[in-house]
Amino acid sequence: MSGNIYMDIIASQVSQGNFGGKNGQFGYLAKDKSRREKKLTKETKFEAPKKKVEEKFECNVFIGSGTAKSTDSNGLSDPFVIIWSVDAEGQPDKSLFKSKVCKKTLTPNWDEKGTLKLKESYKSLIVELWDHDLLTANDFIGRARINVDAINIKKYSYTFKDTISVYDGEISTPSGTVYIEITNSSSTKSFSSCA
């Protein structure tokens, strides 16, 4: 827009082919309008900031045997394991792995393998032990945290092996244990456990 309504009307009519079109006596108005619009477009062009590409890598996980406190009326539990990622703010991000349910036992043996897809921003992993219930909500048994330490191991494979004690809030007495192995052969992270 030039600010002069009459000039804008004439320029608009010239663009539509009236008054001899762009080659007619008022053709320069359409060309000026076109230049002004291009200039405005260049000046107001918005470029979104480029996102940093976050490194991602995979680790193999093995969930072995463990223990679980009794949560069912029959004196047993139906335990299963969930592994969660933890974001940069320390909050659970998403479920990375869920084991099968071992029915009616206090000494489960999952003997299960899987893959964890990790991101560079993950600071730790949470291992949770749950009791599966069919008719009611699952019962929480306990949780533990595995820290993801920034150690350069690009040239070496690394395996974290530990029987992790999980706690339901009372730090003094574990409510269960989970044997876990995390094998990392191609990334830049190693793992250590903490309660």
UniProtKB/Swiss-Prot annotation:
Classification via Gene3D superfamilies: C2 domain (2.60.40.150)
C2 domain segment(s): 38-161
Keyword DNA damage: no
Keyword set, alphabetical order: Calcium, Metal-binding
Top-rank taxon, per record: Eukaryota
Xref: SMART domains: C2
A Pfam family this chain is assigned to: C2
UniProt-recorded Gene Ontology molecular function terms: metal ion binding
Cofactor(s) the protein requires to work: Ca(2+)
Binding site for Ca(2+) 1: D72, D78, D131, D133
Positions that bind Ca(2+) 2: D72, D131, D133, D139
Protein name: C2 domain-containing protein DDB_G0290753
Organism: Dictyostelium discoideum
